[in-house]
């Protein structure tokens, strides 16, 4: 117990706040009651020991090996003293039942939620993280590093240790080996042999993981055993001294052992409180800078200034706990955001714990250009921890004068952006966006950057919004950096950057407004070119597929088609190619559907990579191709999707195309309209019962459309209910037939009956209202023109609300 209490390891674990500190005491209770019950033949003691075995499983993942360790010891006792062990069978049974009873609630949870049991283990176990051929060597290295962590080189991580400090210093290490030798020498005393079994068994959680070694937090279960072994070694030394110096036996052994323990404890205290605790990296890891931030933020708030905290976490819990008022500061999250809050012209002070949240270079440059650095904040030991900047007085005024390029509704204005127009494929795509808040949002918002190719296929997207919407105030401006890793094998060519904003959850995209007019659902940030330089050059892949063009081109991966789709859908497939040599000419491919009889019923041809001809590929370059397949003309049924390249054919997967019920006859309807929208879609009429309605009712409106030609793009239907002043009191926007029949899948002359049920607000006053309908382009948001109205809205009917 003394060895444990004075050890650096136990001191560190007990103060770190991790649940693994609970493993050793619960293990000790389990071992004590199991051993004493086994020796005395006490069934209730063995049952209590089993209960503590079940309890330890509630503490930490590494504790899962404790029942295994106990089982190995029980097997050893059965081998060494079979009669005695079998005579205690009732106690063993009770121990197992008690263990299962205590573990049962947690076991039931794991049964219902197996991911909670497997996920973390799957992230670290060598069997899931390491190629099979490398596992034996890795386990050997882990074993040596784990055992070496006791006496040679300890855990390298400051969170769990003074980096490199072994569990036992040079003067204590010999007693560990001495105690281990004593336990093994008395191999028939099962209570002593439990200690080496315990040591090895509870080292397994560390040995079996693929991580930095040694892993002190995963081997905390060995504490009772390893300190008991050292105690055995000290006891042996004590006895030896008594035999060698019998005349001094009353004080010499006791005095020497006491001095050794005092010295070891003093060194541990010095290492922990005097060395480890004063390290700047420990101060940062333990969130010390946020104590400084909280104090300074409150000072600035009381002085009427606006503190901006640049942090890794929103409203950092350390600051919140110490000084709750620090939460009133402006918090910028992550290293890719720099807000300029405008609070009536109040001075802005930036508090930047730069070691914890290092701003990206583009934002550093902006901060240094716009603000003057002041005296930093220091740790209690004098280390610089938080940099402080004061925003120049004229910056906010200059920001307010900037004109907007576009706006998302009435909430966010895009001021400008910077994006390299030509870049190699060797580095991430970086875009610096400058925007202004126009309003305080009522909920969360998502601002995302999408990258499309010239065929309209999306290749990348990134969401970045370190300035949380609940902090937005009108006039705030923000510099926001987007950094996108390029996909493996992305072809050279031209790409378009699009900026979109939606409500949290990705629903409800905001319209883009330019000069008071809606222009679409995204802000076009322009086109850029990825040059051929920096392609993915890889060693030749083993031929999991045969070469599609012998000696020239190999398909190395493909994305299977969806299991099912509907007629009229567009699906995307991805193929990953490798050039074995530069093709002499440009290669085309064909994707086809084969029916159950192997007959080709549908096919489309494509350039292998439209914007990056194969004649420009480099030898061994890996290039990804993406292909959009329109199923508008594909017949329904089960098919196999196949790839044709020259004379070579490769199946890509099976797909079931579900039939869409199509009609070319006009259905019965309450009123005929015959109004053409655009040049493609005719509204034949509608069905709507004429009975009066009440607030909260649903209008059972059905619109009947007819395609005059095959529509070239997707359109959405809008239904507006307006009052006498023209104000919209209820509306619905959706693709036809509740999003299941996109207009791009319609055939010429096809008739589509489209239910567009509109819910009336519960507080809607009685009176007459007008029902307006129309179509708009799903991408540009532009309404299709109609002969019935200049604004693209057709007055359909009058609705009476009682």
For every predicted segment, state its role:
Residues 1-134, 138-243:
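Membrane-integral, polyisoprenol-dependent glycosyltransferases
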Residues 249-305, 309-336, 399-408, 612, ...:
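Membrane-proximal, lumen/periplasm-facing interface regions of secretory-pathway glyco-
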Residues 297-326, 352-353, 430-454, 572-576, ...:
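Short periplasmic/luminal acceptor-recognition loop of GT-C membrane glycosyltransferases, typified by
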Residues 337-418, 424, 506-552, 637, ...:
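Aromatic/acidic, Gly/Pro-rich catalytic loop(s) in extracytoplasmic/lumenal soluble domains
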Residues 421-426, 563-568, 691-696:
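Short, solvent-exposed loop/linker segments at the N-terminal edge
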Residues 438, 484-492, 580, 628-636, ...:
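Short, surface-exposed loop/turn segments at beta-strand-coil junctions that are enriched for proline
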Residues 466-478, 517, 606-623, 734-752:
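Short proline/glycine- and polar residue-rich coil/turn motifs
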Residues 488-491, 501-512, 633-635, 645-650, ...:
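Short acidic/polar inter-strand loop motif in beta-rich domains
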């Amino acid at each position: 117990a003394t060895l444990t209490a004075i050890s650096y390891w136990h001191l560190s674990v007990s103060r770190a706040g991790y649940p693994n500190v609970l493993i050793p005491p619960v293990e000790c209770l389990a071992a004590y009651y199991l051993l004493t019950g086994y020796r005395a033949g006490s069934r209730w003691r063995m049952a209590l020991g089993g209960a503590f075995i079940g309890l330890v499983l509630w503490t930490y993942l590494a504790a899962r090996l404790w029942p295994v360790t106990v089982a190995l010891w029980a097997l050893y006792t059965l081998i060494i003293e079979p009669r005695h062990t079998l005579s205690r069978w009732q106690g063993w049974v009770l121990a197992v039942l008690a263990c299962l009873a205590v573990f049962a609630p947690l076991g039931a949870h794991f049964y219902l939620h197996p991911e909670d049991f497997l996920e973390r283990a799957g992230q670290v176990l060598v069997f899931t993280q390491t190629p099979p051929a490398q596992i034996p060597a890795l386990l050997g290295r882990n074993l040596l590093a784990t055992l070496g962590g006791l006496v040679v080189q300890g855990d390298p991580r400051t969170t769990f240790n003074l980096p490199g400090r072994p569990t036992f210093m040079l003067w204590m290490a010999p007693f560990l080996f001495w105690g281990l030798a004593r336990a093994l020498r008395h191999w028939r005393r099962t209570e002593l042999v439990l200690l080496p079994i315990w040591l090895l068994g509870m080292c397994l959680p560390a040995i079996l993981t693929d991580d930095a070694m040694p892993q002190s937090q995963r081997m905390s279960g060995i504490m009772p055993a390893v300190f008991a072994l050292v105690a055995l070694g000290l006891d042996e030394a004590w006895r030896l001294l008594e035999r060698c110096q019998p005349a001094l036996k009353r004080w010499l052994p006791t005095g020497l052992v006491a001095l050794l323990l005092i010295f070891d404890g003093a060194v541990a205290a010095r290492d922990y409180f005097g060395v480890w605790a004063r390290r700047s990296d420990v101060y940062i890891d333990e969130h010390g800078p946020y104590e400084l931030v909280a104090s300074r933020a409150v000072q600035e708030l009381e002085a009427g200034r606006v503190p901006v905290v640049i942090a890794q976490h929103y409203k950092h819990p350390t600051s919140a706990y110490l000084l709750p008022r620090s939460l009133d500061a402006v918090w910028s999250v992550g290293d890719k955001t720099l807000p300029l809050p405008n609070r009536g012209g109040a001075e802005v002070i930036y508090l930047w714990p730069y070691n914890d949240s290092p701003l990206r270079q583009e934002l550093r440059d902006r901060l240094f250009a716009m603000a003057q650095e002041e005296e930093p904040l220091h740790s209690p030991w004098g280390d610089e921890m938080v940099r402080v900047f004061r925003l120049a007085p004229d910056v906010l005024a200059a920001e307010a004068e900037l004109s907007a390029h576009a706006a998302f509704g009435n909430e966010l204005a895009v001021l400008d952006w910077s994006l390299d127009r030509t870049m190699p494929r060797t580095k991430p795509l970086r875009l610096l966006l400058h925007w202004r808040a126009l309003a305080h949002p009522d909920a969360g918002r998502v601002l995302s950057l999408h990258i499309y190719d010239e065929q309209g296929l999306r290749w990348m997207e990134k969401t970045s919004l370190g300035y949380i919407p609940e902090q937005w105030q009108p006039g705030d401006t923000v510099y926001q950096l987007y950094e996108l890793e390029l996909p493996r094998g992305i072809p050279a060519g031209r790409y378009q950057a699009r900026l979109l904003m939606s409500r949290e959850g990705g629903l409800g995209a905001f319209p883009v407004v330019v000069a008071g007019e809606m222009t679409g659902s995204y802000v076009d940030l322009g086109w850029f070119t990825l040059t051929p330089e920096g392609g993915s050059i890889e060693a030749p892949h083993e031929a999991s597929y045969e070469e599609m063009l012998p000696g020239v081109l190999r398909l190395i991966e493909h994305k299977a088609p969806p299991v099912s789709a509907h007629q009229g859908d567009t699906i995307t497939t991805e193929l990953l190619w490798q050039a074995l040599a530069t093709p002499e000419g440009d290669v085309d491919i064909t994707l086809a559907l084969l029916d159950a009889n192997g007959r080709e019923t549908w096919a489309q041809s494509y350039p292998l990579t439209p914007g990056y001809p194969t004649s420009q590929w480099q030898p061994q370059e890996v290039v990804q191709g993406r292909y959009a397949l329109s199923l508008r003309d594909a017949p329904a049924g089960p098919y196999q999707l196949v790839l044709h390249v020259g004379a070579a054919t490769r199946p890509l997967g099976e797909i079931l195309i579900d039939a869409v019920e199509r009609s070319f006859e006009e259905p019965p309807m309450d009123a005929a309209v015959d109004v053409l929208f655009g040049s493609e879609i005719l509204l034949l009429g509608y069905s709507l019962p004429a009975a009066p309605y009440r607030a909260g009712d649903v209008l059972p409106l059905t619109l009947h459309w007819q395609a005059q030609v095959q529509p070239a793009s997707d359109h959405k239907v809008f239904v507006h209910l307006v009052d006498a002043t023209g104000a919209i009191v209820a509306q619905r926007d959706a693709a036809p037939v509740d999003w299941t029949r996109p207009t791009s899948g319609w055939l010429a002359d096809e008739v589509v009956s489209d239910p567009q049920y509109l819910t009336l607000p519960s507080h809607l006053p009685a009176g007459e209202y007008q029902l307006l309908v129309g179509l708009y382009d799903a991408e540009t948001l532009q309404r299709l023109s109609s002969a019935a109205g200049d604004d693209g809205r057709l007055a359909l009917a009058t609705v009476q609300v009682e």
